[in-house]
Every structure is written in structure tokens, then in C-alpha cells.
Amino acid sequence: YTFLTGRYASSSHSKIFLKECPAGTQALPAFNVGLESDRMNVGRVLEDAGYATGFVGKYHVHDTDHSKEGSLFGDLDVPKNAKYSDQLNKRKFKLEKLQRELVKKNGFTWAKNIYWGNLKSPFKGHNPDWTAQAALEFIEEHKDQPFYLHCCSTLLHGPNGEWFKSMMEKELVTGEGFLKKPLNLIDRKSVWERIQKAGLTEAEVGYLWMDDSLGLILDKLDEL
């Protein structure tokens, strides 16, 4: 929130935050701050300055009270620990497309491959390939004009054990449900081999995995 708006999180005036922490009371910012309806954030400001502004990856800053999405569409994400079904997977896919539009409504000109919040079963699993794929697409589409890309990796969030489990077992899970085939943008086997060669453990794979995903984006920028 602070990086997107330049405001201290405790200065948020989003409705969801003020409902929990009314003005004049002790502020406790956590999962209760969202981008305000004034759209005063880096995406909107740079858009006004002529930039294409893209958002990929983890969002988790939607103010659910400043619009009617909840009443129109129900929950904006699938319930935690819901039983997997093909129908649920299709709903996850459709919700991610709605989430893209909500991110754009809040100030960005382009959004894709969105994680709405924290990872939740049955779609719990990191997939930096999926985030990087959207980042590369945005850069390619806007390489001939000024652009700003906000890329948020889920790998910044633990627990560490989930990094290794995701890397070895969950190459199909994404923020839009399960893919039909892996993206294979990052060599996961190589990540694990280099971690072991460095004398590190499963608990550290997320750092190198994230580094490789960011490397894809930096390499793309170097090509321009």
C-alpha cells in the first residue's frame, strides 16, 4: 500500500480501514488497507503523465467497500480450503479476469496474472513463471512508449517450506486456477541444483527462484 500510494499505511482513508480504525483512534494497519477510490496511486499518476502502467502478481490492496463488486459478483476470490472441482477451477479463472478489471479501475492501464491476496488452498502454490510471463508480455507490448511495471512476487511471502513444495509439486497452480501444462520459463531443476551446490537447503530455494524470475524481466529490458 505504501509503495503504491506514498502514504503511511496508518494514513489510509480507505473505507475498509476506517471501519476498523476510525479517525482519532489507534491505527492498526494490516490486511485492512486498500487503494482509495480517489485513485491517488503510482499507476494513476504515471498514467496521467503519459505512461502505460502495468500490474502483475500479488495485489492484496483492494478496498472492498468503495464499490459494489461484492454484491454484484459475490466473493472476489474462492473460499479458503474449498474442495477442488472443475467448476471451482473455472470460477477461479473467471474471477482473475474480474480482478484484472478492478486493478485497472483503481488506476493501472494494464493488469494480468493477478494474485488477489494470500495464497489459499486448493490453489495454494507459488508460480513465478506465471507472474513473469505477464511481465514479459507487458514489456513487449509497451516497449515503444514510456511504461511503468509494478511486479509483485508471491515469493516474498513464506512460509519457506511452501517455496520448495510449490517448486517441486505445483507447477500448474496459478492465480487463475490450474493450467493445462507448465509454462517452463524457469528451470526449477536448476534452481534446486544450485541451492544444493551452494550448501543451502530447501528453506532457501525461494530466494534463488525469485532471483531467476526477476532475471527474466531484466534480461527482457536489456534486449530493448
Predicted features and spans:
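Active-site metal-binding loops of divalent metal-dependent hydrolases
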Residues: 7, 59, 154
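Short, hinge-like loop/turn segments at secondary-structure boundaries
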Residues: 4-9, 70-80
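Active-site neighborhood of divalent metal-dependent phosphoester/pyrophosphate hydrolases
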Residues: 29-30, 56-62, 82, 86-87, ...
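Active-site-proximal cap/lid insertion segments
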Residues: 87-106, 110-224
